[in-house]
Regions:
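Short intrinsically disordered, low-complexity coil segments enriched in acidic
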Residues: 1-4, 30-33, 109
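Generic detector of low-complexity/intrinsically disordered segments
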Residues: 5-6, 23, 41, 47, ...
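Short, low-complexity intrinsically disordered segments enriched in A/P/G/S/L with frequent Arg
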Residues: 3, 13-16
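Feature marking well-ordered beta-strand scaffolds used for ligand recognition
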Residues: 45-526
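Bacterial N-terminal signal peptides that target proteins for export
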Residues: 8-10, 21-34
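Bacterial N-terminal signal peptides
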Residues: 31-44
């Protein structure tokens, strides 16, 4: 299903921006009602008891101690692959310790993706939902961080909504806390950590700021000694400002010093904003949060329609465009001046037959379709001062009667790992009760789904409700809620479930796998 995205407003930043019945009749009527209830609602309650898939296969499942899972991160540590999974608030029994523990961070050895081993659970904040747990997890090796112990591996995580902290996870079975980077916050979320520089963009709720979430930037090159760099947000969020408050930040993605861009996604499910920011100016420009200083590093701002959000903004740079290979602009025709120098895993923008794009994914937040639908949107940022929307994509609701299944239905998040196996070829996007969807992005102007995997519910899967507690019209259904997704450098795919179902490890099969760029796969296979 393709819905052309035509409404994007772009602002260019400027440096200086019944009757009574017999008993028998009554019972017959009651039996009919009960039977009707089962027919009407039973399917919705059990629709996902079996997995549904196309060109994807389940390798393994771990229930993550039935904790509501948010974010999986997979890191290679020597000859092992370790998964770190951040959790939403709540508490569950930890069989490894025999104690009830607040949801925090699950650590698993996924070296053998068909037999993951649960190693440790680091408890998080005791709060519920978004206010507890430890949703975010980012991992860097000391060998890449400029001032760290080269023998160590470090985990940056949120602690509920109040703090960000760093842990030593060199031995993942025995993690230890290194330091608290910042505390006293009123919210946190999905931060970004540059492993080659140590710069951390920490999604935070500073009590002095008007927005629930903005960015605190730290130099974490020496994880034991964080150095504060600056606070940053959209103009109108800062202390002392007036007027409507721009929507909260969800999370940034940085290209690091070589790419010199940071993409900030705001708004999740409404009033979305995407900022394209000059990294060098952000880090080294004037830091007092005045209007001029907040506008200074902004290259462009994309204001989405009020019903649309921006959860993830993933750059897809240097995309080959064979359709344009024969185009020959005049010698004096302006050329894109982004100045990107892409890393080894990102192809360079070399000719007119290559263009740069941003995959923007909104987040669905209401159960049973009681809100606006969120999409995957493709924005052409070849001229990043003049971004333009070129395509939108969505899962057709009728393909699975998803509005009737319970829980959320709609987009949430994409993977972020830029492994060349998938980069510029396939985009993995979670759609809650529609599971994981795989989109062929080789032609950003014509997105196509090529695979999907909807996990089966289990006895651990929690219900999702509509209506107020104790209200007569309140209804609840058990439903898969595929929350976030990530891939590792081997091409395995990890799906975290929000409704306590756990972690699913899957792989591509069939025609979809042939689109990927697996080592040793011939061009003919692709």
């Amino acid at each position: 299903m393709r819905l052309l995205y035509k409404r994007i407003t772009v602002r260019i930043a400027r440096p200086t921006h019944s009757n009574f019945l017999s008993r028998e009749s009554y019972m017959r009527r009651w039996h009919f009602v009960v039977a009707g209830f089962v027919l009407a609602f039973g399917a919705g309650l059990t629709a996902q008891n079996k997995a549904e898939s196309r060109d994807m296969a389940l390798l393994a499942h771990n229930d993550l101690q039935a904790r509501s899972a948010y974010m999986p991160t997979i890191h290679r540590q020597g000859d092992r692959y370790i998964a770190y999974v951040g959790h939403h608030g709540g508490q569950m029994m930890n069989p490894l310790t025999g104690r009830m523990e607040p949801n925090g961070t699950s650590i698993l050895d996924v070296t053998n993706p068909r037999s993951p081993r649960y190693l440790f659970h680091i408890p998080g904040d005791a709060g519920q939902g978004e206010g507890g747990g430890a949703q975010m997890a980012a991992v860097c090796s000391g060998a890449t961080l400029p001032k760290a112990d080269r023998t160590k591996v470090y985990l940056l995580r949120s602690f509920g909504g109040s703090a960000h902290e760093i842990w030593d996870v060199t031995t993942p079975e025995k993690p230890s806390r290194v330091t608290v980077v910042v505390s006293g916050l009123r919210d946190t979320h999905k931060s970004f950590w540059e492993c080659d520089t140590g710069i951390g963009y920490l999604v935070s709720g500073d009590p002095a700021w008007r927005a629930e979430r903005m960015t605190k930037i730290y130099d974490l090159s020496n994880p034991a000694s964080p150095v504060f760099i600056r606070d940053y947000g959209v103009f109108g969020q800062q202390p002392g400002s007036t007027g409507p408050v721009p929507t909260d930040l969800h999370g940034p993605i940085s290209l690091g010093p070589k790419g010199n861009r940071v993409y900030f996604a705001h708004g999740t499910g409404r009033a979305g904003i995407v900022q394209i920011v000059d990294r060098e100016k952000l880090l080294n420009g004037p830091k007092e949060p005045t209007e001029a200083n907040l506008r200074y590093p902004v290259i462009a701002q994309i204001d989405l329609p009020p019903e649309s959000g921006a959860h993830t903004a993933l750059p897809l740079l240097g995309m080959p465009m064979p359709e344009f290979a024969k185009q020959r602009p005049p010698a004096n025709h302006p050329q894109p001046g982004m100045g990107h120098e892409h890393g080894d895993t990102i192809p360079r923008l070399t000719t007119g037959a290559h263009r740069d794009f941003l995959a923007v994914v909104g987040e669905t937040t209401g159960n049973e379709c009681l809100e606006n639908r969120q999409f995957v949107r493709m924005v052409d940022i070849t001229w990043d001062t003049n971004p333009i929307g070129v395509e939108s994509w969505n899962v057709p609701e009728a393909s699975g009667n998803f509005c009737e299944r319970g829980g959320r239905f709609g987009a949430h998040a994409s993977h972020e790992n830029t492994t060349p196996i998938y980069y510029g070829r396939l985009l993995f996007v979670t759609f809650f009760n529609a599971g994981l969807r795989v989109v062929d992005v080789r032609d950003p102007y014509d997105l196509k789904e090529v695979a999907y995997y909807i996990p089966a519910t289990t006895d651990k899967t929690d219900q999702r409700c509509v209506g107020q507690a104790n209200a007569p019209d309140r209804r609840c259904k058990v439903a898969i809620q595929s929350n976030n997704v990530e891939v590792d450098d081997r091409g395995y795919i990890y799906i975290a479930d929000r409704a306590n179902t756990g972690l699913h490890i899957v792989e591509l099969t069939g025609a979809a796998r042939r689109i990927a760029n697996f080592p040793g796969q011939s061009t003919a296979q692709r």
